[in-house]
């Protein structure tokens, strides 16, 4: 299958590479010359522009940082035309960016008028899942379009869920990430309290992991350095899912909550804590570094 892939960041790059390795004919692009150079060295064909990727493509995939980037890509900005004016009718567009559900619906509605099918398919699983091809896709759009996309998604992920109409995938994603942000703060708070009282963080982590407080962070992503060798915490919080990305997703959750008048007090508090953590200079560190905000000074 001929696929255009736009966005070769920490997630998009490995996803595109998995499609290339699976035998699909790819043309990829990123605004970052370094990203293009990195994946070209791994054999990924790189186009000169986003517009150049879609020529002859049966499927267009985008993996971009925020709503504004997706809006600019498909609708254009200034004198530059958007991709919707270049993508032929009958093409399937898969947007795996995590953005506002309203933006996904806007793109899908405009595309439908041109005979272009669009699904929003944000992912969960982190960079490790992107590399291993074990991501979880949360899909919004027409169910028939998901079935068209399934052979492509299966080369990048292990779990594919149909959430509903356009924008539903985005809503599912921000619900998941709101819970993840809250969960990480709660886990960090408990560990910081235990350590402040002289407990060994490894022992406390195991106690909680095997008790009613057990959760994904304790199992896979412990925020305390030295407890879990594979977690970003033991690598000076490098890599993983950045604090600023978590802050963005929590912001999306609160915008959505306000739009539908849903009560999310813990989501709002989590957003405020991550905002404070980012302002303290930790925006580029993994989101589990929020434990620094909660630790007793001098501990």
Q: Which residues does each PLM region occupy?
A:
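Rossmann-fold dinucleotide-binding core
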Residues: 8, 98-177
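Rossmann-fold NAD(P) dinucleotide-binding segment
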Residues: 50-62, 66-117
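NAD(P)+-binding Rossmann beta1-loop-alpha1 motif at the extreme N-terminus of oxidoreductases
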Residues: 1-63, 91, 161-162
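Helical "substrate-binding/catalytic lid" subdomain
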Residues: 169-269, 273-298
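Hydrophobic beta-strand scaffold residues
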Residues: 26, 46, 117-119, 160, ...
